[in-house]
Amino acid sequence: MKYNDLRDFLTLLEQQGELKRITLPVDPHLEITEIADRTLRAGGPALLFENPKGYSMPVLCNLFGTPKRVAMGMGQEDVSALREVGKLLAFLKEPEPPKGFRDLFDKLPQFKQVLNMPTKRLRGAPCQQKIVSGDDVDLNRIPIMTCWPEDAAPLITWGLTVTRGPHKERQNLGIYRQQLIGKNKLIMRWLSHRGGALDYQEWCAAHPGERFPVSVALGADPATILGAVTPVPDTLSEYAFAGLLRGTKTEVVKCISNDLEVPASAEIVLEGYIDPDEMAPEGPYGDHTGYYNEVDSFPVFTVTHITQREDAIYHSTYTGRPPDEPAVLGVALNEVFVPILQKQFPEIVDFYLPPEGCSYRLAVVTIKKQYAGHAKRVMMGVWSFLRQFMYTKFVIVCDDDVNARDWNDVIWAITTRMDPARDTVLVENTPIDYLDFASPVSGLGSKMGLDATNKWPGETQREWGRPIKKDPDVVAHIDAIWDELAIFNNGKSA
């Protein structure tokens, strides 16, 4: 499934009935969110609003509104194929040399994919077809959405932020929301542990008082966008990973005003800087929790240049109580996480982040239990192995006879295999998403682990219950005579 840029991808979606063009004038203030939310909840297509009220630039929304479109963006036919992406990432995280000719032959596809990792640098690029700078910069010309009635201001939601630390060769790509506060100013809301914020902190330490260069790409190709939200190894750039997904090298171009490299095919690029002395209160905004978040101070991003393609498209989304687009992304990326975790913990059978748990706040893990205390080791591993699970508040561990994705199974295991005092692990004073207002202190809270596995000697002194199993001969006999019983006149089986 090949595409070169966002426009190629939209053509592919339209051919498959996965894109709907909206010609009726619709207001970016609240109305686009309402339409996109209804469409996403119905499993509908990506939406291209061609006539947003008050603007000449179209708005793309709900691009990754189904797991299928996330998989397509990663170059795969369906969600199940994302397990292979996870296996590739697990290999890149801890590459192993071939153990012999046969192993080398088996790993050739992985080595071949690695050839697409280096970026291709262009002298000129579509994203620089039109350039404005200085006083001509006006972010109000972009149809930035206001998503919820009590939001503080219009909000950029799909901005691919490009940064580089003072002592690093590779750039960092991250998705951080940005509040519009002036014709050339945005608030950069990045949490302190995220890559862009870490680059900024290192810059301030190395160059006190100096401006920190930042660029933001809007409407990059899907592989690059998804690369920025995928748990790539720290040694691998998001551009390199995008090349692996796409099957071709990622094309980049140097910015007009700084040395950062941005996706050459991006629809819009914002170039500028962060002044360490300029902060502003951000929010409140309706967030993925389904609540408005607290107001907090973050750095101000001053835009000095806007470059864009001819007839540029503005890519946007909204966040709210699941399901929303981030929740759908979480469902799809869940398949990527599983092989990465299994590489470190082979006993893990499945790993599931229920979307109704805000995509990351609760995890269900099933394991092949091998010893007493095994479930607790897995809990600690989930919390510590990947940064993505730093904010996971609840981890439920079950045996492999439980379907991690079936709440009927999980609740049955919790209520029959757990003693609340013995099998609950509480860890206090751990990092928590600052958006989690349920924690007693902003950014610091507790975690709970639930051991819903069968208990081994040493974990209990009682004889453990034996699960009921049907007699297979009786089952086979009843299967054979079921239709004759005619219990359900419509032929329904039981």
Curated annotation (Swiss-Prot):
Q: How is the cofactor bound?
A: Binds 1 prenylated FMN per subunit.
Q: Which GO terms describe its molecular function?
A: 3-octaprenyl-4-hydroxybenzoate carboxy-lyase activity; metal ion binding
Cofactor(s), names only, from the UniProt record: prenylated FMN; Mn(2+)
Q: What is its main location?
A: membrane
Q: According to its UniProt record, which residues of this chain constitute the active site?
A: D287 (proton donor)
Signal peptide range equals: none
Q: What protein name applies here?
A: 3-octaprenyl-4-hydroxybenzoate carboxy-lyase
The source organism is Shigella flexneri serotype 5b (strain 8401)
